[in-house]
């Protein structure tokens, strides 16, 4: 006869423990965004004016749009995917320098996103609490036809680069990929496979200078970073050695008229054995 009250007691106790456990779990997972946001802003104020215009906490109404705009892999655009605590959208060098220094100061992981084109979402997901430094505002392009060079910031897309070069010259080009929404920073940091590979090499083979911010917040170019680091950032992977701000590359000659053709083969026609 005492079984039912005992079961009721155990059920109530279990339910209470479950509620406490869930609450504790949610509380532990919930990021201390306001606190981190204020600490981060206070730190950034030392390096730039009005940092609140470029820093978005995950409580900001604009946060979801900014985060999702450059998530190229839908697998990581889910409610269960861990989100960054903050997104920083730099507009000038000091913003990047301050972000690197402040992320190091508060001991939080920093992810650099330049277009978001990677199969594993490496630039916008992490198992640890993290901040995204999103380079989409960093997209200025300067084309110097006379000297046959171009300076392109990391957030510019390949499509934008091709168009700006075409505006200035019909006989100059840059060897890079075919996807117009891939950003320069990530593409060139990974080597830059392109359609003119056989004649002009990889994209990185045509890079003659770069501007980066290193882990100490120093602004460096090819001369000040040295040839070893300059060699490493051209294919060594985005964000491995610093934050890429811009690349300077030589333009290559291209014909005014280009002939494009397409060959289609079916399996019945031994398409698997067909190699161009």
Predicted regions and their residues:
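N-terminal accessory segments
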Residues: 2-200, 206, 220, 232, ...
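A glycine-rich, basic-preceded beta-loop-alpha segment at the flavin cofactor/substrate interface
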Residues: 213, 218-254
